[in-house]
From Swiss-Prot:
UniProt name for this protein: dITP/XTP pyrophosphatase
Reaction(s) catalysed by this chain's protein: XTP + H2O = XMP + diphosphate + H(+); dITP + H2O = dIMP + diphosphate + H(+); ITP + H2O = IMP + diphosphate + H(+)
Upper lineage: Bacteria, Pseudomonadati, Pseudomonadota, Betaproteobacteria, Neisseriales
Residues reported in the UniProt entry to bind Mg(2+): D70
Domain of life, source organism: Bacteria
Cysteine pairings via disulfide bonds: none
Subunit relationships: Homodimer.
Record-linked Gene3D superfamilies: 3.90.950.10
Organism: Chromobacterium violaceum (strain ATCC 12472 / DSM 30191 / JCM 1249 / CCUG 213 / NBRC 12614 / NCIMB 9131 / NCTC 9757 / MK)
Length: 197
């Protein structure tokens, strides 16, 4: 087992969440900015390919094991869109407000509001790792026209959880981290790592 890895992201929230869990295994997680690793392009049409590209990129430039994720919202009535384009659905520069407005606009008159958040995590032990560790999670919900809640980010105010009766933005942060698509993927990845330790 390695004692440190690079997170192929500069997101402070992800660093904190991943850092706490990997600390249980004696692994220090460092953001790619610590190594001056530039953002990796995401040219692919699947979450898995993008996450693998980011992990290999960070590992290649640092010489360390690397962890990357890719995630987004998929809407059944839109054929799975915005999917891998979730962050830039309404174009550049990225804007949660514009992305949400476009999503609601595209669903006008559509009865089927079924959607899911998807996350895949990829861990490579080295840049050319032939057998990366992969874990994913899916969180089912539905898109609502009206935003609800102040928490979260991205599509959370419009992503309603029928089982909870609230939007993701209204959910307690600790509960969200436990049951979300990212939480599910992280739990699955940690189980795989512990089995290898």
């Amino acid at each position: 087992m390695f004692d440190q890895l690079v997170l192929a992201s500069n997101n402070a929230g992800k660093l904190k969440e991943f850092g706490a869990l990997f600390a249980e295994l004696g692994v220090t997680v460092r953001p790619q900015r610590d190594f001056d690793v530039p953002e990796c392009p995401e040219p692919h049409h699947t979450f898995l390919e993008n996450a693998l590209e980011k992990a290999r990129h960070a590992s290649r430039l640092t010489g360390l094991p690397a962890l990357a994720d890719d995630s987004g919202i998929c809407v059944e009535a839109l054929g799975g869109a915005p999917g891998v384009f979730s962050a830039r659905f309404a174009g550049e520069p990225k804007s949660d407000a514009r992305n949400n407005a476009l999503l609601v606009e595209k669903l006008q008159g559509e009865a089927n509001r079924r959607a899911w958040y998807y996350c895949v995590l990829v861990l490579v032990r080295h840049a050319d790792d032939p057998q990366p560790l992969v874990a994913d999670g899916i969180w089912l919900g539905e898109v609502r026209d009206e935003a609800a809640g102040e928490g979260g980010f991205g599509y959370d105010p419009h992503f309603h959880l029928p089982g909870y009766g609230v939007s993701v933005a209204e959910l307690d942060a600790a509960e969200k981290n436990r049951v979300s698509h990212r939480g599910q993927a992280l739990a699955a990845l940690m189980a795989k790592l512990k089995a290898l330790a």
